[in-house]
Amino acid sequence: MPDLQELWNYLQEKFQTDLTTVGFNAWIKTAKPLAFRANELLIEVPSVLHKEYWENNLATKVVEGAYEFAEIELTPIFVLPGESDNLTPLEPEEEHVLTKAETPTFLRETHLNSKYTFDTFVTGKGNQMAHAAALVVSEEPGVLYNPLFLYGGVGLGKTHLMQAIGHQLLESKPETNVKYVTSEAFANDFINSIQTKNQEKFRQEYRNVDLLLVDDIQFFADKEGTQEEFFHTFNDLYNDKKQIVLTSDRLPNEIPKLQERLVSRFKWGLPVDITPPDLETRIAILRNKADAEHLEIPEDTLSYIAGQIDSNVRELEGALVRVQAYATMQNAEITTSLAADALKGLKLNGKSSQLSIAKIQSVVAKYYSLTVADLKGRKRVKEIVLPRQIAMYLAREMTDSSLPKIGQEFGGKDHTTVMHAHERISQSLTTDQNLKDAILDLKNTMKS
């Protein structure tokens, strides 16, 4: 076992970067590590409220942090003052299952989306190579392109192609063991397996497969323990000539804080990008969607809709749904004129060619009582770092500027700094209501 205080200091540093000062003082500074007990870490917290908060929000971070620090699999046990005196030592074979832990997803069957097949995938210039590579992999898994690494923006069909490989392989070889999972689910399964002492079961589930499909691999960033586990999973499968397919929104070497040995392995096979569909492909996608929904839409109307949306397939199909709903409410046939009314004022992705990075910087600086020079500068104090990251995030979300361009506008910062800021804010938005409110306020201010 590592030194208890050294481990706790490491965990505190992690929490300090993840939590606000108020949150850190309220939850972390009031807790103290007591001792190791078998494969458990006893942590004393001052109240039932603190205990519930730790179990529901912070326990998984303790598991992850312990694995990162010393490659040990610890289960955190939270006790109130005086409770530790009544705890008896655990025998090695005893199991303690946290009541909060859910059944890991690897104990439940993972289903492929029945709609994501090669038959329903519309090919075009932006995805031809990815489609061809996916077909090859589905016919000869583990031979030519291993791993197959599909990368590109949101809503371009990466998940569709990935799952199509699984469907095709199962159709030709029904006995094949196919596993589809998001990177987030893999990480959660790994952490839950430690908490429930099911590590061996976890490894059997993920390593005893013929085809492993892992979606959105970029979310492994900052998860050192999960990366370590996936490294060994990858090696086992690759050495057994089992096929691995990964998707990401960027190339392996552009994923921040991804271990170099994983970057290297992800490049062993074929990295292939998927770009936004051209006009002809967008029309074909809409026609395919309309046929599937049994919609009667004139060709010129499909062309009009395709001309309005050039970002991704998801936005494109969403626009068609919007037009269909509008026609239903109006009790009218779908025409180009009706489509124009339905899509009027629609700002896809919230991006605006009129909105400048300078405007975003000005609004954010005023909101946080800072100067634009603060946002462009290099001071690393928390009161400036967060607003700076928010401004970079909004510049990425609300303008068409490239990463290097945004970095240049923020005092000549590297594009990877912008990528990290966008990733950090995106992840925080899933849990931080105050941040959500601030982003909404800022967006409304800039749109008004």
UniProtKB/Swiss-Prot annotation:
List positions binding ATP.
155, 157-159
Q: Where in the cell is it found?
A: Cytoplasm
* Keywords linked to the UniProt accession: ATP-binding, Cytoplasm, DNA replication, DNA-binding, Lipid-binding, Nucleotide-binding
Report the PROSITE patterns cross-referenced here.
Answer: DNAA
Its predominant location is cytoplasm
Q: Where is this region: Domain II?
A: 72-110
What are its GO cellular component terms? Answer: cytoplasm; plasma membrane
Q: Where is this region: Domain IV, binds dsDNA?
A: 328-448
Give the GO terms filed under biological process for this record: DNA replication initiation; regulation of DNA replication
GO molecular-function term, one example from the UniProt record: DNA replication origin binding
InterPro entries referenced in this protein's UniProt entry, alphabetically: AAA+_ATPase (IPR003593), Chromosome_initiator_DnaA (IPR001957), Chromosome_initiator_DnaA-like (IPR020591), Chromosome_initiator_DnaA_CS (IPR018312), DnaA_C (IPR013159), DnaA_dom (IPR013317), DnaA_N_dom (IPR024633), DnaA_N_sf (IPR038454)
- Give the region (Domain III, AAA+ region) as residue ranges: 111-327
- Region of interest (Domain I, interacts with DnaA modulators), residue spans: 1-72
What's the short name of a Pfam family annotated to this entry?
Bac_DnaA
Gene3D superfamilies recorded: 1.10.1750.10, 1.10.8.60, 3.30.300.180, P-loop containing nucleotide triphosphate hydrolases
Q: How does it assemble?
A: Oligomerizes as a right-handed, spiral filament on DNA at oriC.
Q: What is known of its domains?
A: Domain I is involved in oligomerization and binding regulators, domain II is flexibile and of varying length in different bacteria, domain III forms the AAA+ region, while domain IV binds dsDNA.
According to its UniProt entry, the function of this protein is described as:
Plays an essential role in the initiation and regulation of chromosomal replication. ATP-DnaA binds to the origin of replication (oriC) to initiate formation of the DNA replication initiation complex once per cell cycle. Binds the DnaA box (a 9 base pair repeat at the origin) and separates the double-stranded (ds)DNA. Forms a right-handed helical filament on oriC DNA; dsDNA binds to the exterior of the filament while single-stranded (ss)DNA is stabiized in the filament's interior.
Family note: Belongs to the DnaA family.
Q: What is this protein called?
A: Chromosomal replication initiator protein DnaA
